[in-house]
A protein has these predicted regions:
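N-terminal secretory signal peptides that target proteins for export/translocation
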Residues: 1-2
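N-terminal export leaders
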Residues: 7-8
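C-terminal motif of bacterial Sec signal peptides marking the signal peptidase cleavage site
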Residues: 17-18
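N-terminal secretory signal peptides
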Residues: 27-65
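Mature extracytoplasmic domains of secretory-pathway proteins
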Residues: 52-103
Length: 136
């Protein structure tokens, strides 16, 4: 019996360590930059992007970000939606109104399943006010 326990323990440890990376995560995401628009003063960059990842469970989504020039895009710091790895927005277009106002036009999911998710949008970041236009 002790030999079986040792074998079972060894198998559990090997399985658990082998599955560690299967869940994906931000480091395994594939991010495609669709559009980048620098602010009029060049201090900020608005970006629309597509992201996929998540390992076996998988996800893909479109979103937008606003970052300081020189910073990398953080796909988990999107401006659109409550859950940062959910779909819910598409056809994202960016336009600077002026140096302190950014306009984001996009299509928004209408399904009841997305109601809570699409209800949240970041209103400002880095002192930039963000205006949303829904195109559907």
């Amino acid at each position: 019996m002790p030999g079986r326990r040792k074998t079972l323990f060894t198998l559990v440890v090997l399985f658990a360590s082998g599955c560690h990376g299967w869940g994906g995560g931000p480091g395994t995401d594939t991010v495609e930059i669709l559009s980048e628009k620098p602010s009029p003063n060049g201090r900020f960059i608005a970006t629309s992007f597509y992201c996929e990842g998540g390992g076996a469970a998988g996800y893909c989504y479109w979103n937008a970000s606003l970052r300081r020039a020189g910073d990398e895009v953080d796909q988990r710091d999107g401006l659109l939606g409550k859950h940062k790895t959910w779909k819910g927005f598409s056809d994202i277009k960016l336009r600077w109104i002026d140096g302190s106002n950014l306009e984001i036009a996009c299509r928004q999911a209408k399904s009841e399943a997305y109601r809570d998710h699409v209800s949240e949008k970041v209103e400002s970041r880095h002192g930039i006010r963000i205006h949303y236009i829904l195109t559907n």
